[in-house]
């Protein structure tokens, strides 16, 4: 059985090339680059896209013109062989330098950038009528594009939240759009500026009139879109007001590039679970939580502390004199014991006299009385009594002799 032939497959359609307001080769040097790098660049809305070649569909990097501050011409500081033209794009967070081969390309890039940023065709550049006509067409396209989208500085916040955002992130801008307080299609504008060191917060009402927005000021001004409302506040304040753009360079959700096994195409995927930490193996037991112990049980288990040793008596460090009588009598010795005792200074030890004290005078013994006493005790032994009397006389004579010698030494 014959099978129906399938139609031949046609060539795979490639993606449509991106549409740019203006595109050409452009050499770029960022704040982290040491030298210029050549790209194929294109202006797309409020962004400058950089490609490796004019055949690439995805840009390598972009510059956000919503952070535009000013354009500045660069002086030629290189060698005489460098005939390129230089200009710088100053943004709120960085400054990027560019280099092009001709003056026409330099003026074209500056003209288109100012057209999409300021929503007007610049008149201070060296441009031909054809160039001005091209920029007028770009201006119309950009106004239509912005009318269909909400400005980046429009946030769904309340009046108080808008004030807090402008106060907390002053580096992100000082002008913010929010829904009106009447619950209708109206819009409110909140601004915050510093005057003599003090913040000044203002709120403006924008009414909806059909397809237009009317700024409710002394001289009401009608705008075709919310983007035009933002541009009105920026241009009429000499760019003192800057649209609020919260820095969201960091992602909040983890993602990765995943390839489809069926068709082989790559797509951005987000994990379906959030791991709080490394999972434990199945055979590893989880540690048990600590058991709370009451204070009373802990006190019962604690060993008793040994008693503290007694402190030494401070009086032991002092020498107490024995029978140290006062040297003189004072009038205030009758003070009661309840009064505060005054510590006395230790007395100096008394000096010994240079000469020994005089010995007390001993009376002379009565020889007759002594002789009579011993005579009675010895009974009738006259010979013993006479010998004893003789010895006593000798002792008495010896004592008298020693006494006379001592008196002689004293005198």
Swiss-Prot record:
Widely expressed. Residues 20-120 form the PH domain. Keywords: Coiled coil, Cytoplasm, Membrane, Phosphoprotein, SH2 domain. This is Signal-transducing adaptor protein 2. The keyword ATP-binding does not apply. The modification Phosphotyrosine is found at residues 22, 250, 318, 330. It is found in: Cytoplasm; Membrane. GO terms for molecular function: signaling adaptor activity. SMART domains: PH, SH2. InterPro entries: PH-like_dom_sf, PH_domain, SH2, SH2_dom_sf, STAP1/STAP2, STAP2_SH2. It is a peripheral membrane protein. Residues 390-410 form a coiled coil. Residues 152-248 form the SH2 domain. It comes from Mus musculus. The lineage of its organism: Eukaryota, Metazoa, Chordata, Craniata, Vertebrata. Phosphorylated on tyrosine. Phosphorylated by PTK6 at Tyr-250 modulates PTK6-mediated STAT3 activation. Residues 291-320, 338-364 are annotated as: Disordered. It comes from the Eukaryota. Substrate of protein kinase PTK6. May play a regulatory role in the acute-phase response in systemic inflammation and may modulate STAT3 activity. GO terms for cellular component: cytoplasm; plasma membrane. Interacts with PTK6 and CSF1R. SUPFAM superfamilies: PH domain-like, SH2 domain.
């Amino acid at each position: 059985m014959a099978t129906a032939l399938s139609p031949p497959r046609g060539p795979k359609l490639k993606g449509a090339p991106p549409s740019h307001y203006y595109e050409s080769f452009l050499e770029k040097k960022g704040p982290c680059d040491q030298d210029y790098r050549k790209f194929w660049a294109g202006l797309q809305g409020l962004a400058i896209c950089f490609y490796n070649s004019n055949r690439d569909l995805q840009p390598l990097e972009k510059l956000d013109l919503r952070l535009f501050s000013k354009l500045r011409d660069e002086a030629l500081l290189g060698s005489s062989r460098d005939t390129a033209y230089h200009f710088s794009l100053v943004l709120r967070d960085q400054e990027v330098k560019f280099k092009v081969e001709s003056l026409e390309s330099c003026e074209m890039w500056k003209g288109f950038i100012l057209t999409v940023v300021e929503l007007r065709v610049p008149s201070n550049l060296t441009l031909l009528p054809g160039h001005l006509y091209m920029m007028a067409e770009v201006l119309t396209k950009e106004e239509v594009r912005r009318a269909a989208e909400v400005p980046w500085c429009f946030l769904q916040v309340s009046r108080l939240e808008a004030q807090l955002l402008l106060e907390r992130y002053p580096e992100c801008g000082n002008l913010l759009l929010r829904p009106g307080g009447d619950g209708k299609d109206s819009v409110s504008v909140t601004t915050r500026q510093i005057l003599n060191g003090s913040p000044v917060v203002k709120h403006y009402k924008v009414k909806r009139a059909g397809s237009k927005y009317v700024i409710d000021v002394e001289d009401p001004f009608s705008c075709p879109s919310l983007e035009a409302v933002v541009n009105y506040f920026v241009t009429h304040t000499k760019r003192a007001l800057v649209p609020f753009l919260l820095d969201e360079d960091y992602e909040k959700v983890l993602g990765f590039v995943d390839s489809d096994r069926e068709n082989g195409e790559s797509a951005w995927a987000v994990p379906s679970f959030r791991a709080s930490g490394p999972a434990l193996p199945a055979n590893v037991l989880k540690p048990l939580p600590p058991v709370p112990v009451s204070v009373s049980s802990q006190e019962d288990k604690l060993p008793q502390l040994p008693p503290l040793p007694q402190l030494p008596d401070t009086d032991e460090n002092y020498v107490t004199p024995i029978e140290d009588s006062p040297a003189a009598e004072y009038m205030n010795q009758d003070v009661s014991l309840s009064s505060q005792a005054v510590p006395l200074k230790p007395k100096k030890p008394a000096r010994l006299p240079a000469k020994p004290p005089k010995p007390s005078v001993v009376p002379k013994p009565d020889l007759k009385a002594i002789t009579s006493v011993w005579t009675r005790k010895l009974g009738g032994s006259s010979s013993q009594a006479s010998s004893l009397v003789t010895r006593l006389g000798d002792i008495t004579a010896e004592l008298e002799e020693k006494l006379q010698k001592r008196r002689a030494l004293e005198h």
